[in-house]
C-alpha cells in the first residue's frame, strides 16, 4: 500500500517502512507526526481525493532534524567593485513512515 501526501508545498509518494526527507517540521526527534493531507491512496483499493481523501492519514516517526549541504550564492556587478557572497543550508526533517490509515 502506498499514499501520496502533501507537505512543505511538495507531493511525496510514501510506503510503510520508508525513510523520507521533508521540509523542516516543528517536531522533536522520536515524536510521532501525522499527515492529514493525503491526496491518493493506492494498493488493493484505490482512493483518489478531491482534493484530499476523507478520513485518511499517514503516521510517521521523526528520526532526525538536520540541515542540508551548504550552497554558495555569489553575486557581483562588473567594473563596480561590488560583490556579495552568501551561504545557505536548507533545514530538513528525516522521517520513517509507520502506518497508512485509509
Curated annotation (Swiss-Prot):
One of its GO terms (cellular component) is cytoplasm. Keywords: Ribonucleoprotein, Ribosomal protein, RNA-binding, rRNA-binding. It holds the Pfam family Ribosomal_L21p. One of its GO terms (biological process) is translation. Residues 79-102 are annotated as: Disordered. GO terms for molecular function: rRNA binding; structural constituent of ribosome. PANTHER family: 50S RIBOSOMAL PROTEIN L21, LARGE RIBOSOMAL SUBUNIT PROTEIN BL21M. Part of the 50S ribosomal subunit. Contacts protein L20. NCBIfam families: L21. This is Large ribosomal subunit protein bL21. It comes from Staphylococcus epidermidis (strain ATCC 35984 / DSM 28319 / BCRC 17069 / CCUG 31568 / BM 3577 / RP62A). The lineage of its organism: Bacteria, Bacillati, Bacillota, Bacilli, Bacillales. The gene is rplU.
